[in-house]
Design a protein with these regions (language model features):
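Soluble non-cytosolic domains of exported or imported proteins
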Residues: 53-65, 116-121, 125, 140, ...
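N-terminal secretory signal peptides that target proteins for export/translocation
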Residues: 1-6
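Bacterial Sec-dependent signal peptides at the C-terminal "C-region" and cleavage site
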Residues: 20-31
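Acidic/His/Gly-enriched intrinsically disordered linker/tail segments
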Residues: 141-210, 215-217, 223, 228, ...
């Protein structure tokens, strides 16, 4: 099923060697620049000068895997063009990702000098940032919906593209979803701007909506259809929309009023979600060390539909690196001077 979906936006890696130009403030620092073509979209990848232990092939494969994941969920890459700036720093890991609507889409993200190939292919942050491209910019009090969508959709998108295992996603959600529950003094999602409510409160909203949309439509529609509806109506990060407009468009795509109704419940008052009951209905059991998925649970079909039951991760991630490495060997980029 994944192969058929991806064939419509086959990802080609095109590496372009570019020369940096001088400006009135002096010559720019050396940079490595390459371009990914994802369907009809271009991703210009610029790596700032600095020490990295991974070769260019692995950086391109990392960007490709993230773009592949996002395209698998939305049916296409969200914007025609985005610039991705990778900024090396001393240390390990991926940090400080930020996404902007300027120039058609711009992402900057930090990468530690000691980061390994394996760590890159297990990274979630770049996929999270690319998902931001697929939702319109809304007022600051609604920042929770922007972060919530990226937090919730990211693992699903990676599973759909075979870059993550389903069991890992549910284990992570069992651990992290409670961080989104309202605490004492909470005034609703629009009025409570803590880290937990912004990221995990937003994710909790998305999760609750996804299950309810699927319940009301007999599993024919889900949050994915709602978010694709927004994107297909022109709602990407370069556009400024009222949140109520985005939710109305999303509801029209599913033939329900789930998102608008849930927003009206949660926007200005604390609403807790019975997560233990959700896990039970979906057939998700945690034994203290691992997740077990029960197919005899009442909503097991909804659980399977949410993730798309993609094949286990591993081999495809390695294949992405090998594919990018082969392309680089043929069309090697070089540092601009």
């Amino acid at each position: 099923m994944l192969q058929a979906r991806l064939s419509r936006f086959q990802i080609f890696v095109v590496l372009l060697a570019l020369l940096a130009t001088s400006c009135s403030l002096g010559a720019r620092a050396p940079q490595m620049t390459s371009t990914l073509i994802v369907g009809n979209s271009h991703i210009d990848v610029t790596v700032d000068d600095g020490k990295l232990n991974v070769p260019q092939a692995d950086l391109i494969a990392w960007a490709q895997a993230a773009a592949e994941s996002v395209a698998s969920y939305y049916g296409r890459f969200p914007v025609p063009h985005v610039s991705l700036r990778i900024m090396p720093f001393s240390g390990h890991g991926v940090r400080h990702g930020m996404t902007f609507g300027m120039r058609g889409g711009f992402i900057k993200i930090g990468l530690g000098s000691d980061t390994t190939k394996a760590a890159l292919m297990n990274d979630w942050m770049l996929t999270h940032e690319m998902i931001h491209l697929a939702f319109p910019s809304v007022a600051d009090e609604h920042h929770w919906i922007e972060e919530g969508i990226s937090t919730y959709v990211e693992p699903i998108a990676r599973i759909r593209a075979s870059h993550m295992k389903e069991e890992q996603m549910w284990a992570d959600l069992i651990r992290d979803m409670p961080k989104g529950q309202p605490e004492a003094g909470d005034q609703g999602l629009d009025r409570t701007h803590t880290w937990g409510r912004t990221y995990w409160g937003g994710a909790l909203f998305c999760f609750d909506a996804d299950v309810e949309i699927r319940r009301q439509t007999q599993n024919k529609k889900g949050l994915q259809d709602a978010l694709r509806g927004i994107l297909n109506a022109g709602g990407n990060i370069t556009e400024d929309w009222e949140l109520t407009k985005a939710l109305k468009v999303a509801d029209q795509a599913t033939g329900t009023t789930v998102l608008t109704d849930l927003y009206n419940q949660m926007k200005d008052k604390p609403v807790s979600v019975d997560l233990q009951e959700k896990w039970k209905q979906l057939g998700i059991e945690w034994d203290g060390s691992a997740v077990h998925l029960r197919d005899d649970a009442p909503q097991a079909a909804i659980r399977r539909a949410i993730t798309g039951a993609a094949s286990p991760a591993g081999s495809n991630a390695d294949a992405s690196i090998q594919s990018a490495a082969n392309a680089i060997a043929v069309m090697a980029g070089r540092k601009s001077s």
